[in-house]
């Protein structure tokens, strides 16, 4: 119940709503189904609220499971104090749990491990206790592994460095100070790898971590990955050292070395990794949310129903690919013309005549021009032709993903006899007629909805974009007699196999006119119905 209360407080929903959503999900109901058909039970929660409840439940469950594991492991070691147990139980992030667990994790053999095994722990304690004449005291701890006083003191320092670097309170202090006061920086590493100088503004860049914007984080990550940039940090090291020294009474000089090593060799690198991870997670979440919103708007563009459309896939050298589709999206014909340079004048003139012939023969009402290579030149060509053809207009269509679709198994199945370029022209025409029906055939990541879509977690991006597609399809609805398997598969309760069976049933039995007929589709049981 504590988990439910956290979800309720965070999301502003009731305990009953949370219980209903999670119960329905456990029973196999999908988010679109719950949002559309269980409004009474959920109190009219929409898809976004339902998904937020499910996601937060997963996150809190993972956190609780990890706490349970960590507590059990520390208890096995006999080192679980009431204070430590409470700290772990109160931790709100996985990263905080890992910080508390760090001193108790099984480690590979370190210099500190070897020093402890050689019995140097008491000498380390003497450093902390400001032992007078430490060098003479160290003579009592010499061994084969640490044969000199210098070696023994160095070993004792290693023990303290590891202990301080793993102290949860000091690590939290360091983390908070870095979050507030440190800068993230970047400098030029190899200009030859940035021919177009895409990353020029990051050649000499610095920004407070607290003010870092998501798109800058993703840009630094990409520049670093490509070998163009070197990313680093500037820390208030002196300020941190003063904080640390205030925690220790020892003034023998060795403690300064301990603190310096603990910070520079252990804590700062660890905190930098943590903060880079956190900045990236925040940036990814923001980018994915933006990509999802862009995709949603794209899918919800109003369809242009009942019009004969000519799809125009522009190109320079290889010629423009044309495809005419009827009012239902059925392909009528395809053609290749050479309307722009480097085509010769005679080829361009022939292209004009061919375009006019197609418009007249198939009663084309609107031309959809792809916005890719040679789009401007093609637009000028089409505009010139349409001066001689009344009542026909053109529109520029976002062709992102059309080439991906044209080379896909689905496109090969739809148009096995056509080249990929002609399939692409058909896709451009159809996405003007019905953007949703056509775009669902394409992997959402290929539709071109965001600048950094290849720099974020592909798993999280796919899940988010797939959720948007499912939500929009179920919001808009589909025509069971015309929808493709790709579109049907996003309907709540249906999958790829059932969707293909629906289309096959249509082809064999004709138009579906009643709900009773739907139940006759193979594999479409009462639960899916």
What is each model feature region?
Residues 308-325, 351, 355, 484, ...:
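Extended, hydrophobic alpha-helical segments in both membrane/secreted and soluble proteins
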Residues 29-47:
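Feature marking long nucleic-acid-engaging regions of large polymerase/nuclease enzymes
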Residues 26-28, 116, 233-235, 314-316, ...:
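Flexible glycine-/small-residue-rich
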